[in-house]
Amino acid sequence: MGRKKKKQLKPWCWYCNRDFDDEKILIQHQKAKHFKCHICHKKLYTGPGLAIHCMQVHKETIDAVPNAIPGRTDIELEIYGMEGIPEKDMEERRRILEQKTQVDGQKKKTNQDDSDYDDDDDTAPSTSFQQMQTQQAFMPTMGQPGIPGLPGAPGMPPGITSLMPAVPPLISGIPHVMAGMHPHGMMSMGGMMHPHRPGIPPMMAGLPPGVPPPGLRPGIPPVTQAQPALSQAVVSRLPVPSTSAPALQSVPKPLFPSAGQAQAHISGPVGTDFKPLNNIPATTAEHPKPTFPAYTQSTMSTTSTTNSTASKPSTSITSKPATLTTTSATSKLVHPDEDISLEEKRAQLPKYQRNLPRPGQAPISNMGSTAVGPLGAMMAPRPGLPPQQHGMRHPLPPHGQYGAPLQGMAGYHPGTMPPFGQGPPMVPPFQGGPPRPLMGIRPPVMSQGGRY
């Protein structure tokens, strides 16, 4: 077998007996504490190097290593880190560390034994508490004066009810302990464990815990057969809530009327058809005063108009547009009729109406009794032709100058243009005035009074 290696010691300083985690840190410590020149503060590596530096540079002699413990101040001993330490000092260091390790182990073992003993001491009071509970179980239960002792619930020791804190009664005239209930207000286990108890219907599976069965008012325990007289007296003393509805209170005026109306519509029971179930008419409710009366009146008028239109769809509406005149608003709101479009209303204006001659009345001519010829000369109206109308021109004749000559037209000669202003009797004539120039030809220069 190979030789067993000795356990490597942790880095430590031989001069001051101090432990370090790393040998590099130990070397830095020795240079700063033990091998530093006290004159020029130069850091050297060994003790002999410090002595030589002081002798050659400062002409001084050093006989001891600074900051060293007594007995380890030899300046001639060359130690660098862990190297150069005497063997006897290394063995002594190992022996000291082993003793220290043994002492620490003994302390840990002693502390562990003490902790085990403390745990045993902690478990002792629990047994005494159980004994005390057992002794209290044999003690008779004490109730309030005038009330017999309460029977313990099945499955619970008799002394548990005496350990529970008493609660003062919530209703005057009713004791806080009743038959079938414990002092803390909890129902007895017997009533819950026996669903077919006489006088109480069986517990329903759909009811959550804490909800009384149907037929019992919340807050009243079930009546037992042992004390029927006491339970009936308690029930008779309970105040009956009044069924009469409270008087209607005045509704405060909201800051924003729309929000107040929304709240008024939302409040109240609602049926399956999303209609309020109360029979109070809406007209009896007092409407709050709106912040903006003009807009509110316009909304009310629009609503009333819509309701009247829906109720009477067969009647024709010829009413004028509704005009709102308010004292608080400066604007004037006009609401046109919804059944008539804006185009139809505009067509009814007088400027779009056509003046048709009545029977027995002479036609009205915008141009007077004379008409203007093609060259601007005045021409007398011919008999048998309708007068010219201003702003009207008829389309080209079907055969005109591009086809066969017109037949049956008075004053027309073949090969020539028909006189300007004439045409079929049923076609309105052209507008009088000078002819337009052809494309690409400049108009003639006329006098100062002419059109050009």
Curated annotation (Swiss-Prot):
Q: Where in the cell is it found?
A: Nucleus; Chromosome, Centromere, Kinetochore; Cytoplasm, Cytoskeleton, Spindle
Q: Major place of localization? A: nucleus
* SMART domains recorded: ZnF_C2H2
Cite the residue ranges of zinc fingers (C2H2-type): 11-34, 35-58
- Keywords from the named record: Cell cycle, Cell division, Centromere, Chromosome, Chromosome partition, Cytoplasm, Cytoskeleton, Kinetochore, Metal-binding, Microtubule, Mitosis, Nucleus, Repeat, Zinc, Zinc-finger
Against InterPro entries, the record matches this protein to:
Znf_C2H2_type
Superkingdom, taxonomy of origin = Eukaryota
GO terms for CC? Answer: cytoplasm; kinetochore; microtubule; nucleus; spindle; spindle matrix
Region (GLEBS) residue ranges read 329-361
Q: Where is this region: Microtubule-binding region?
A: 1-92
Reported impact of F256S: In xBuGZ13S: Impaired coacervation
Q: Where is this region: Disordered?
A: 99-131, 298-330
Query: Ranges of Acidic residues compositional bias?
Result: 113-123
Gene Ontology MF terms? microtubule binding; zinc ion binding
Which Gene Ontology terms describe the biological processes this protein takes part in? attachment of spindle microtubules to kinetochore; cell division; microtubule bundle formation; microtubule polymerization; mitotic sister chromatid segregation; mitotic spindle assembly; mitotic spindle assembly checkpoint signaling; protein stabilization
Q: Entry's PANTHER family?
A: BUB3-INTERACTING AND GLEBS MOTIF-CONTAINING PROTEIN ZNF207 (PTHR23215:SF0), ZINC FINGER PROTEIN 207 (PTHR23215)
Function of the molecule: Kinetochore- and microtubule-binding protein that plays a key role in spindle assembly. Znf207/BuGZ is mainly composed of disordered low-complexity regions and undergoes phase transition or coacervation to form temperature-dependent liquid droplets. Coacervation promotes microtubule bundling and concentrates tubulin, promoting microtubule polymerization and assembly of spindle and spindle matrix by concentrating its building blocks.
Q: How does it assemble?
A: Interacts (via GLEBS region) with bub3.
Q: What the record says about its domains?
A: The GLEBS region mediates interaction with bub3. Mainly composed of disordered low-complexity regions outside of the C2H2-type zinc fingers. Coacervation depends on hydrophobic and aromatic Phe and Tyr in the disordered low-complexity region, that may promote coacervation by forming intermolecular hydrophobic interactions.
Put simply, this protein is called: BUB3-interacting and GLEBS motif-containing protein ZNF207
